[in-house]
C-alpha cells in the first residue's frame, strides 16, 4: 500500500482535524456566561453550573442532565450582577428627609436617592445651598452634588440681597435716564438717581416727595463707618442720648437707617430735613451735614 504524499496527505490531515475544531465556538459561547462550581447533594457529583443574569436568582442549581433554573426577583428585591444567590437582595436604601428618589427600586438595581432641590450632598449629608451675601453674586447655582458658587460683584455691578440664585446686576445709568446722580452705586446697592435739584428747608411743595426720597437715599447709603451709622441711628431714635446698638453689618444698618428716615418722613409734615440735620449734629457728623446742605438746600 502506497503512502499518501503531496496534496493527498494535506487533504487527509484537514479532514481529520475538523472534528477537533468544530466544538470551539460552542465552548467559547458557554464561556461567555459566568459559571460557578456546585456539588450535587444527591449524587455527590461536582458540577460547573451557569450563573443567573441580573434581575434573577438561582431557583434550582444545575444537574448532570439539566441546566441552572433561574427565577425572577420578587417585588422590592433585586440582583445587580450575574450571580448564584439563592434569594434576591432586598432594596434596603431609604431616602432621608432632605432626599428624593432618583431611581426607583428595580429587579436589577437598588433604590438610589439624591438631595432635594435647595440641598447638596457633602460628607454623607444633604446641606442647604449657601446664599451669596450682599455684594456677591451667583456664578453657578447649587446642584444636588455641589454648593452655590459665589463671586464678589465686579466694578459696575451690584447685588443688594442674600440670594442663592441671583447674579450681580449692572448699575443703572442716571444720565441715560435723564436724571441726576444721587448716590454712586456700590457692590451692594444700585446707583441711585433723582430728579430733585433742591427744595425749601421746611415747606412742603408739589414735587417735594421726590426730594425727600433723594435725601433719605443720599444719607442712608453714604460710604461711612459702621460706628458712625450706629451713632446716627441712635441720634434719630433718642436725641438726648443713646444706648448700645446690637452689632450688625453695614448693609443691615444702612437699610435700618433708610427705614427709620422713611418713618420720620411719614410722621413729620415737611420737617424731615430739619430733623435729619439736627441728628447729624448730635451724632457729630459735620462732613455729612455739610454735604446734605450743599446738595439739597438752595443757596440764597
From Swiss-Prot:
GO terms for cellular component: extracellular region; extracellular space. GO terms for molecular function: signaling receptor activity. Pfam families: TNFR_c6. Disulfide bonds join 49-62, 52-70, 73-88, 91-105, 95-113, 115-126, 132-150, 153-168, 174-193. TNFR-Cys repeats lie at residues 31-70, 72-113, 115-150, 152-193. Transmembrane segments: none annotated. Keywords: Apoptosis, Disulfide bond, Glycoprotein, Receptor, Repeat, Secreted, Signal. Decoy receptor that can neutralize the cytotoxic ligands TNFS14/LIGHT, TNFSF15 and TNFSF6/FASL. Protects against apoptosis. This is Tumor necrosis factor receptor superfamily member 6B. It comes from Homo sapiens.
Amino acid at each position: 500500500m502506497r503512502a499518501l504524499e503531496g496534496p493527498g496527505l494535506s487533504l487527509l490531515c484537514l479532514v481529520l482535524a475538523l472534528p477537533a475544531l468544530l466544538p470551539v465556538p460552542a465552548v467559547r459561547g458557554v464561556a461567555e456566561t459566568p459559571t460557578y462550581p456546585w456539588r450535587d447533594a444527591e449524587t455527590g457529583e461536582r458540577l460547573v453550573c451557569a450563573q443567573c443574569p441580573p434581575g434573577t436568582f438561582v431557583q434550582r442549581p444545575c444537574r448532570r442532565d439539566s441546566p441552572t433554573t433561574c427565577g425572577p426577583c420578587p417585588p422590592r428585591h433585586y440582583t445587580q450582577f450575574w450571580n448564584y444567590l439563592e434569594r434576591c437582595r432586598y432594596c434596603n436604601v431609604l431616602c432621608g428627609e432632605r432626599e428624593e428618589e432618583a431611581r426607583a427600586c428595580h429587579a436589577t438595581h437598588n433604590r438610589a436617592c439624591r438631595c432635594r432641590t435647595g440641598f447638596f450632598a457633602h460628607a454623607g449629608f444633604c446641606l442647604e445651598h449657601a446664599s451669596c451675601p450682599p455684594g456677591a453674586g451667583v456664578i453657578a447655582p447649587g446642584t444636588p452634588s455641589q454648593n452655590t458658587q459665589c463671586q464678589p460683584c465686579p466694578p459696575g455691578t451690584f447685588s443688594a440681597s442674600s440670594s442663592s440664585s441671583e447674579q450681580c446686576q449692572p448699575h443703572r445709568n442716571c444720565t441715560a435716564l435723564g436724571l441726576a446722580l444721587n448716590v454712586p452705586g456700590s457692590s451692594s446697592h444700585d446707583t441711585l438717581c433723582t430728579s430733585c435739584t433742591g427744595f425749601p428747608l421746611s415747606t412742603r411743595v408739589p414735587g417735594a416727595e421726590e426730594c425727600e426720597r433723594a435725601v433719605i437715599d443720599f444719607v442712608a447709603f453714604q460710604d461711612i463707618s459702621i460706628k458712625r451709622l450706629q451713632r446716627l441711628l441712635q441720634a434719630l431714635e433718642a436725641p438726648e442720648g443713646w444706648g448700645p446698638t446690637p452689632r450688625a453689618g453695614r448693609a443691615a444698618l444702612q437699610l435700618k437707617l433708610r427705614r427709620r428716615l422713611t418713618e420720620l418722613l411719614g410722621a413729620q409734615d415737611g420737617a424731615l430735613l430739619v430733623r435729619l440735620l439736627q441728628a447729624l449734629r448730635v451724632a457729630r457728623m459735620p462732613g455729612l451735614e455739610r454735604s446734605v446742605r450743599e446738595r439739597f438746600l438752595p443757596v440764597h
